[in-house]
Structures are given as structure tokens and as C-alpha cells.
Amino acid sequence: VMNTVPGADVLVIDDNSPDGTGDWCDERAAADPRLHCLHRAGKQGLGTAIIAGIRYGIAQGYDHVLNMDADYSHHPRYIPALIAGMQDDGGPGHDVMIGSRYVPGGGIEGWPFMRHLMSRTVNLYARVLLGLPCQDCSGAFRCYRTEVLRRLDLDSVRSRGYSFQEEILWLLKRAGARFGEAPIVFKDRERGQSKIHAGEALSALWIIFRLGVKNWLVTLRKVVPASST
């Protein structure tokens, strides 16, 4: 990351990982002021980890916050395209740029057919229920404009796990954010195993459904004004 974007600071969020990530990060952070480590006690969920990173970026006064997985699935070579999308050739730019597996030029390597099918289905499910203006609603490789993140009530976020990805896009849409996507090729992790399990997946679908009902009710109120008395 630092070789690709030398001017960037890097925050590693470690939930007491047993593989020594925390110690590795502390050792390198002591020698490089661009690297920072946030240690949390135990597994608190993907959503809370990203929120912690967002809060850190806002507190530090950064213009943008970029989130990516640290398991070799997201290649740093895609970062410049995400940053470029925030400027949009001198125009207003986008408020969130998504590293997308599902736009032309994007893709996935190393997944079995059923996982492809599940991912496509969840993305369609989220787009329909939440009205999200993007093809990849569940990917974690994203760049956000902190000016727009400040508009969000992060304390109101319900998702602690993987459905956070869809929920924050829904909140950003409601806040008037401009969305963009740039193609990436996602590689299945080279080490370790995915932490998602059936219970987590069902919980994510339920949270997205509840948000979808709320989204429909808000839309209905706009379409059908309250009757006068």
C-alpha cells in the first residue's frame, strides 16, 4: 500500500488476532510514522472494525478513508483508480468509490460456483431492497469521502458483521452521496479461511430485509402524502 500511495497513512485494526498481526504491526509502526495500529480486545465484528477506522480517519482530519481486506484478496494496485474516481477529472467527484467485482473488467478468482451464486444473489437482493445505485454492494474495497461520512450517525448502525457493507451504502445514499465503481479482480484469500458462516449470512440477510422495509416505508411516505384534516 505504501509503495503504491507513498503519501498515505495506513491503519491496521487488530482484533487480538492469534497470528501475531498486532505484534508485527507494532514493530513496524515504531519505525514508520505512516503506519498506525488499533488494538481491540476480542472479535467484535467486521462492521465495528470499519466504523472504528472511519472514526479514526475523521478524527485525524483525512480527506478520504479507504478500506480494504488485509488477507491478500485486495491488491493495492487498484487504489489509484479508486482515488482518481474521487476527483472525477476536476469535477465534483464521487463520495464513495467501490472496488467492484461486478462491472466490466472486474472479476473473482478462486471461488467455487456456489459461492459465486450466493454473492450474486445477495447483491441483487440488496440492490432491490435498498435501491442501491451500484453493482457490488457487498465488497469491502472502498474509498469514502470523510466530508460525507461526517453526515452519518454511526451510532445508529445496526450491523456488526458483514451486512455493514450494505448498510453503510444505504446510509450514504440517504445522505445524498455520489457513487462510483472501478473494476477490481478479487482473489480468494491465500492464507487462512473465510470467517463468514451460515449464522452470520442469515443475520446479514435479515438486517438487509429490515432496512429494505424501512426504505420502502420512507419511499411510500414521499409518494403518498399525509391526508389533510
Where are these regions (language model features)?
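A conserved acidic beta->alpha catalytic loop
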Residues: 14-23, 72
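A structural signal for isolated positions on well-ordered beta-strands in alpha/beta enzyme cores
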Residues: 9-11, 36, 180
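Short, acidic, metal-binding catalytic loop of nucleotide-sugar glycosyltransferases
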Residues: 1-9
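Acceptor/aglycone-binding surface of glycosyltransferases and processive sugar-polymer synthases
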Residues: 34, 38-59, 64, 76-162, ...
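Conserved N-terminal glycine/acidic-rich loop preference
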Residues: 21-35, 64
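Hydrophobic helical membrane-anchoring modules
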Residues: 3, 131, 155-229
